Structure formats: C-alpha cells, structure tokens
C-alpha cells in the first residue's frame, strides 16, 4: 500500500517563544494537527523569539521560497563581554573595557552593511565534515569554518541608558547570523560583544503582527506561502 496522503495542508505563522528550538515548535504542531509533514522556514536560535513560518502537509514544498527571503530582527548588543556562543546563553570567555558613542557605533555598523563575509559561529547547525558545528563545540573543540557572503541591507543602532548596551534593527539576507554580526561589531570597535533578546519581526512578507501562539495560530491556506511571488 502507498503512503497515506496528508489531509491537513496550509501555513501557520508562529511567534516562537524563548526557550524552544524551531524543531520543538514543529514537534508540538505535529501533535496539534496530527500530521507528520510539517517544516519551518529559517531556523531561530532557542533563546530568540519572533516570526517562524511553518508549512503543513503539501505546503512544505513551498517553504524553500520563504526560507530564501530577507529577515528583519531587533536585538540588543552588549559591548565588553565575549561569550562562547556569541549570545547571552554562553559562558564569558573574554572581557574588554570599552567606551563607545553613537558616531563610533554607527560608523562600525555601516562598515558591516552591504555584502559582507561571515564566519558561522561554532554553536550553529552548519555542517563541517558531515557534522553539525554545535556537536563539535560540545566536545570542546573548534574547527576552521569557511566564510560565506551575506547581505545586510539595514543595520541601525541606538543607545540605551546603559552605555554598553545598544539596540539594533537589522534587515539581512537568509543565512545571516545576527550573533556573528554583533560579535563583529564589537571587534570593529576594538573590543568584543555578544547579543541578547533577539527577535525576528519580519520574515519575507510575514510580520510578527500576523503571528500567533503554537496552540492558537490558525491554519492558513497554502497560497499564503506564495505571498509576494511573481505571478
């Protein structure tokens, strides 16, 4: 007998909560809809929140288009401490005494705008030699990683009451690591940095205002995943 075809098809726009992997979200939605064929477009780090585009049933075939879309994030960048994960979930591995102002931070952000080269962080799902980088990192090892070209079309910064914590809004191509961008900004200013409170507010044509919770977000028509495509 052939495999039973899925009976649930569509798109779901989730506001991913902190503390869950993108796969955790998929697992919960599989239980909710009783459907195995569920996938997501664009992985979010466990501590990150925001837009996660989900395809259910036959809609999974269209996820590659959503995955390739630009993303927009809001994030806080903490200057001074470097961590092994490049975000606040990691262990501090270096401390830098830094003093920065708006002109300096804006200029450094501008230098990281446009087409740039990024080296994937060790704690990431990228594969090297057939293994996930985070698996290698868990063994306490670091390996060489090839840089890749990404495009940052917007990198806006603003100060907060804390002179070493800055807010940023970033619009970038798929595959851009915001953790790496924050660390590179710290390096460009002669020190170090890590990020916290990362939130994806837009994924392609889908905004965070359209999202819902894992339990309550509605199943949308498959055609939602063709939004913005050329006719």
Predicted regions and their residues:
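Catalytic/RNA-binding core of pseudouridine synthases
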Residues: 1-231
